[in-house]
């Protein structure tokens, strides 16, 4: 599933690097990579800080997308297999 998403995003990479979906996709890849790194290196506090910053950026982008286009937001959440934003 993830490999198919990567391939579809790679095909669209040249024309849509600035799109919200591509940015969320790249942040999600960074988050997964940092999470696996932190499982091995629990006391790497700089990586923990970087992970929190990337999580915040992704959260802001997802909030923006959910306000602007709810259908694209739902599709992206399902494709990347991540949870929805908590509503207040």
Swiss-Prot record:
**Where mainly located?**
plastid
The molecular function terms in GO held by this entry are: structural constituent of ribosome
Q: Which HAMAP family does the protein's record reference?
A: Ribosomal_uS15_B
Please indicate if the UniProt record lists Plastid as a keyword. yes
Q: Which domain of life is it from?
A: Eukaryota
Subcellular locations according to the entry: Plastid, Chloroplast
Q: Which UniProt keywords apply?
A: Chloroplast, Plastid, Ribonucleoprotein, Ribosomal protein
Q: Which organism is it from?
A: Arabidopsis thaliana
Q: Which NCBIfam families match?
A: S15_bact
Q: Which CDD domains match?
A: Ribosomal_S15p_S13e
> What is annotated about its quaternary structure and interactions?
Part of the 30S ribosomal subunit.
> Upper lineage ranks?
Eukaryota, Viridiplantae, Streptophyta, Embryophyta, Tracheophyta
This chain belongs to which protein, by name? Small ribosomal subunit protein uS15c
Cross-referenced Pfam families: Ribosomal_S15
The family database entries (InterPro entries) matched by this protein are listed as:
Ribosomal_uS15, Ribosomal_uS15_bac-type, uS15_NS1_RNA-bd_sf
Q: Mention any one GO cellular component term assigned to this protein in its UniProt record.
A: chloroplast
- What is one Gene Ontology biological process annotated in the Swiss-Prot or TrEMBL record? translation
Question: What's the family?
Answer: Belongs to the universal ribosomal protein uS15 family.
């Amino acid at each position: 599933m993830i490999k198919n998403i990567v391939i579809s995003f790679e095909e669209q990479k040249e024309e849509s690097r600035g799109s919200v979906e591509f940015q969320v996709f790249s942040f999600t890849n960074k988050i997964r990579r940092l999470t696996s790194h932190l499982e091995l290196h629990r006391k790497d506090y700089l990586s923990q800080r970087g992970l929190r910053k990337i999580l915040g950026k992704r959260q802001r982008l997802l909030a923006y997308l959910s306000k602007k286009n709810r259908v694209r937001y739902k599709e992206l959440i399902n494709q990347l297999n991540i949870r929805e934003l908590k509503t207040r």
